[in-house]
From Swiss-Prot:
Protein name (record): Putative 3-methyladenine DNA glycosylase
Organism superkingdom: Bacteria
NCBIfam families: 3mg, PRK00802.1-3
EC code(s) of this entry: 3.2.2.-
Organism: Chlorobium luteolum (strain DSM 273 / BCRC 81028 / 2530)
Enzyme category, top tier: hydrolase
Keyword Protease among UniProt keywords: no
Length: 196
């Protein structure tokens, strides 16, 4: 499979929520373990006209990574206990990102099972906090990009349009009406969260 380069991220954020589905997210751990997950669920967040976005008011120290170049990882700590993985998708200087909500485990499953303390494959990455735990992604990963040797995306066949579902986003209290969540209809690895 071919690595996806910077050109892939020139598409608009809302288009990337769909284009990222089916792609393979890869993390190489410091010990050399290869961890791979197929993206099956995404959500878009934009700095303008989206009150659910961390950067909708202004740039701060907390959200500054959202203003960096497309393909940069934005990892934040939610509710004081969960790391969530986003990929920056807007041109540098403009805030926007796609939250990776769920993946299907592809490689490195024993390592993921150990991290997650479960052998049930559908429970390994079926939620945004679960997948960061399985991959060992923490805030220290924020600001790194997908074009090096630790994190990258591999191209893979895109799902058929009929298999892609759209809904409002999960677990938000503002801008709840925006239909900016995409997921694969046939995947048992999609999160169980209900749209807002």
């Amino acid at each position: 499979m071919t690595r996806l380069g910077k050109q892939f991220f020139t598409a608009p954020t809302l288009a990337l929520t769909e284009r990222l589905l089916g792609k393979i997210f890869v993390r190489i751990t410091p010990s050399g373990t290869v961890l791979k997950g197929r993206i099956v669920e995404t959500e878009a967040y934009l700095g303008h006209n989206d009150e659910a976005c961390h950067a909708w008011r202004k740039k701060t120290e907390r959200n500054r990574v959202m203003f960096e170049a497309p393909g940069t990882l934005y990892v934040y700590f939610s509710y004081g206990c969960h790391h969530l993985l986003n990929i920056v998708t807007e041109p540098e200087g403009t805030a926007g990102a796609v939250l990776i909500r769920a993946m299907e485990p592809v490689e490195g499953i024993p390592c993921m099972q150990e991290r997650r303390q479960t052998t049930v494959e559908t429970a390994l990455m079926s939620g945004p906090a679960k997948l960061t735990s399985a991959l060992g992604v923490e805030r220290s990963s924020s600001g790194r990009d997908l074009f090096g040797n630790e994190f990258f995306l591999l191209d893979a066949p895109s799902p058929q349009p009929s298999m892609i579902c759209t809904s409002t986003r999960v677990g938000i209290s503002r801008s709840r009406e925006l239909p900016w969540r995409k997921y694969l209809a046939d995947s048992p690895h999609v999160s169980k969260g209900r749209p807002s």
